[in-house]
C-alpha cells in the first residue's frame, strides 16, 4: 500500500468513525478515538495501527496529553501535520478542564488533590501550581508558575502573589510534585511555605495549604501542622 489509508478504506468492521456513529463513542478504544482525529495512516500502517503506536510510544493517555511536538514526531509515521492535530485536541481538552474549575469549591486537601494529582504525579521534573480562590473558596484559576528544580532561593513570592492579585484572589493554595514519588516535604519545601505564609499575611491573601504530590499520593502541609 503506497498511498495514505483513509478510514473509509479500512474494512467496514474496523472503521472507527462508523463504529462511533453506530455504537457511541464510549464503546471505542483510545486508539480508535485517536484514529478518528488523525483520519489517515501511512504506507506502513493503517490509521488505527498508527494511533496504537503513538499512544503506546508516549506512555498512554497520560503521556499523550503531556507530549511535545518533538516527542510526537519521534514516533514512526508522525509528521508535523499529525503532531499538530494531536496537540490541538489536547489543548481543547485542557481548556475544557479549566472551564470546569470555576464550579469547584475547596473544603479539604483531597479536593485540591483531585485537581492536580493526575497532572503532576508522573512528571519528570518539579512543577509548582498556583490555585487562586475567591472568598467562598471557589477556584478562580489554576496556573503553572515554576518548572524545574524548585528551591527556596528560586521560588520568589512576588511571582506567585502577582498572579493572585491579577485574579483578585482572596486566598491561594500551592501544589508541587516530587518526581521521586515520595511526597515527604524537604527543608526547602518548608522554607518556601513559611515565606509565602508571611507574605500572604502582609498582602491580605492567605496561603491556605501547600500540597506535595508523589506517586499517586500527596501530603498536605496544613494537615501536618507545618502551615
Curated annotation (Swiss-Prot):
Q: Which Pfam families match?
A: RadC (PF04002), UPF0758_N (PF20582)
Q: Where is this motif: JAMM motif?
A: 176-189
**GO biological process annotations for this chain's record?**
proteolysis
List the SUPFAM superfamilies: RuvA domain 2-like (SSF47781)
The MPN domain covers 105-227
One GO molecular-function entry: metal ion binding
- For whether the record's keyword set contains Isomerase, the answer is no
Entry binding sites for Zn(2+): 176, 178, 189
Describe the family membership recorded for this protein in Swiss-Prot or TrEMBL. Belongs to the UPF0758 family.
This chain's protein is named: UPF0758 protein CPE2144
Biological source species: Clostridium perfringens (strain 13 / Type A)
Amino acid at each position: 500500500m503506497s498511498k495514505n489509508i483513509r478510514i473509509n478504506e479500512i474494512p467496514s468492521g474496523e472503521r472507527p468513525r462508523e463504529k462511533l456513529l453506530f455504537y457511541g463513542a464510549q464503546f471505542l478504544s483510545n486508539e480508535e478515538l485517536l484514529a478518528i482525529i488523525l483520519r489517515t495512516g501511512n504506507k506502513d500502517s493503517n490509521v488505527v495501527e498508527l494511533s496504537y503506536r503513538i499512544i503506546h510510544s508516549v506512555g498512554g493517555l497520560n503521556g499523550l496529553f503531556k507530549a511535545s511536538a518533538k516527542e510526537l514526531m519521534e514516533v514512526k509515521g508522525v509528521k508535523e501535520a499529525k503532531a499538530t492535530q494531536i496537540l490541538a485536541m489536547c489543548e481543547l481538552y485542557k481548556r475544557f478542564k479549566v472551564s470546569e474549575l470555576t464550579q469547584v469549591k475547596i473544603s479539604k486537601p483531597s479536593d485540591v488533590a483531585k485537581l492536580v494529582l493526575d497532572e503532576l504525579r508522573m512528571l519528570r521534573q518539579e512543577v509548582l501550581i498556583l490555585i487562586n480562590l475567591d472568598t467562598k473558596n471557589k477556584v478562580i484559576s489554576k496556573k503553572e508558575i515554576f518548572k524545574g528544580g524548585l528551591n527556596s532561593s528560586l521560588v520568589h513570592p512576588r511571582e506567585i502573589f502577582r498572579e493572585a492579585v491579577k485574579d483578585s484572589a482572596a486566598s491561594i493554595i500551592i501544589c508541587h510534585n516530587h518526581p521521586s514519588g515520595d511526597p515527604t516535604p524537604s527543608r526547602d519545601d518548608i522554607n518556601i511555605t513559611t515565606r509565602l505564609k508571611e507574605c500572604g499575611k502582609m498582602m491580605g491573601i492567605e496561603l491556605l495549604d501547600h500540597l506535595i504530590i508523589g506517586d499517586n499520593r500527596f501530603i498536605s502541609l496544613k494537615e501536618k501542622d507545618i502551615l
